[in-house]
UniProtKB/Swiss-Prot annotation:
GO biological process: argininosuccinate metabolic process; L-arginine biosynthetic process; urea cycle
Binding site for L-citrulline: 88, 93, 124, 128, 179, 188, 264, 276
Organism the protein comes from: Pseudomonas aeruginosa (strain ATCC 15692 / DSM 22644 / CIP 104116 / JCM 14847 / LMG 12228 / 1C / PRS 101 / PAO1)
Gene (UniProt): argG
Chain positions recorded as L-aspartate binding sites: 120, 124-125
Protein name from the UniProt record: Argininosuccinate synthase
Catalytic activity, as annotated: L-citrulline + L-aspartate + ATP = 2-(N(omega)-L-arginino)succinate + AMP + diphosphate + H(+)
Pathway assigned to this chain's UniProt record: Amino-acid biosynthesis; L-arginine biosynthesis; L-arginine from L-ornithine and carbamoyl phosphate: step 2/3
């Protein structure tokens, strides 16, 4: 323990990380630097400063990372139309590499020997934090208290906090029965009744979205302007990336968009049920595919779709800073050069419906695609040779007596 003199802790100010703070001070006899990230989770982060100071912390970092989060992590991910296991929009996963990056930056700034986090030994986040940290600073020491201590229940954490004078709320406002994580992209719910995969989630669990049944009876129309694959304006009003996502969360939430209840495969081997609200992200995914549908070459679009599951898996499992993810990102970004234009959407009772798309870079040619007289733009007789050449290998196989049965 003597080799650790200063540790940077990813600190929320909640029970777990407050206990970790004290545990680090006592177990390692070290100085602790706290880092609290504002990723748009909708909670006040300033109380973490007062709590850390009360626990003897001299160096306290509270960083507003909302713009960086959306600009450098969420937007690049959505250029790939990223979805994990067909449904999950990776709201938790995509936040972890930014936190890891900032932990390492602060460790370098403060001369810390180690970093620490509050992720448990049963989840994905420990992997995401630590893979990111090692990629950015190979020799860094990582302290993961949940893999070391014997405080394996909430009651034990509460008892430890009371014993060491850590401010807690044992009584007071009702605590959510769920384990929750939020940022500007989503809010997640795990644990509690959700651990029974047959039990329906309770309606009052959802924080961001109206139920589709109770959403407005009149649809909402919005127009999203794209530049190189990123949304830059809503209804003609220029916005920053964080402003875009904030507004889409608002209008999507009102219309009951973005709820999800899934069982996913964790990287550490177990299956886990999670419920997610991702109103803005759900809208972004639908709209981005719509603008790509008229601006991307067919084979480029198909290749992107083939590679997307691998890209999604890299994010989910913590390999954001890996060479393979960076390589894929260069390809994805190159594909977005002509992904410009406007998408018009109708939002109604949990549904996102594309009702229009236009672009100066559109590859859609109405003169060729029309069902009416095309004035010779497309010679239908050419199709006969095209079909015969593509059928050649199957005709040869059939002539050899090969069958599909």
């Amino acid at each position: 323990m003597a080799d650790v003199k200063k540790v940077v802790l990813a600190y929320s100010g909640g029970l777990d990380t407050s206990v970790i703070l004290k545990w680090l001070q006592d177990t390692y006899n070290c100085e602790v630097v706290t880092f609290t990230a504002d990723l748009g989770q909708g909670e006040e982060v300033e109380p973490a400063r007062a709590k850390a100071r009360a626990m003897g912390v001299k160096e306290i970092y509270i960083d507003d990372l909302r713009e960086e989060f959306v600009r450098d992590f969420v937007y690049p991910m959505f250029r790939a139309n990223t979805v994990y296991e067909g449904e999950y929009l990776l709201g938790t996963s995509i936040a972890r590499p930014l936190i890891a990056k900032r932990l390492i930056e602060i460790a370098n700034e403060t001369g810390a020997d180690a970093i620490s986090h509050g992720a448990t030994g049963k989840g994905n986040d420990q992997v995401r934090f630590e893979l990111g940290a090692y990629a950015l600073k190979p020799g860094v020491k990582v302290i993961a208290p949940w893999r070391e201590w014997d405080l394996l229940s909430r009651e034990k954490l509460m008892d430890y906090a009371e014993k060491h004078g850590i401010p807690i709320e044992r009584h007071g406002k009702k605590k959510s029965p769920y384990s929750m994580d939020a940022n500007l992209l989503h809010i997640s719910y795990e644990g509690g009744v959700l651990e029974d995969t047959w039990t329906e989630h309770e309606e009052d669990m959802w924080k961001w979205t109206a139920s589709p049944e109770n959403a407005p009876d009149t649809p909402t129309y919005i127009e999203l302007t794209y530049r190189k694959g990123d949304i830059v304006a809503i209804d003609g009003k220029d916005m920053t990336p964080a402003e875009v996502l904030t507004e889409l969360n608002r209008v999507g939430g009102i219309n009951g968009i973005g709820r999800l209840d899934i069982v996913e495969n964790r990287y550490v081997g177990m299956k886990s049920r999670g419920c997610y609200e991702t109103p803005g992200g759900t809208i972004m995914l639908k709209a981005h595919r719509a603008i790509e549908s008229i601006t991307l070459d067919r084979e480029v679009a198909h290749l992107k779709d083939e590679l997307m599951p691998k890209y999604a898996s890299l994010i989910y499992t913590g390999y954001w800073w890996s060479p393979e993810r960076l390589m894929l990102q260069q390809m994805i970004d190159a594909s977005q050069v002509n992904v410009n234009g406007v998408v018009r959407l109708k939002l109604y009772k949990g549904n996102v419906v594309v009702v229009g798309r236009k672009s100066d870079d559109s590859l859609f040619d109405a003169n060729i695609a029309t069902f009416e007289e095309d004035g010779g733009a497309y010679n239908q007789a050419d199709a006969a040779g095209f079909i015969k050449l593509n059928a050649l290998r199957m005709r040869i196989a059939a002539n050899k007596g090969r069958t599909l049965s």
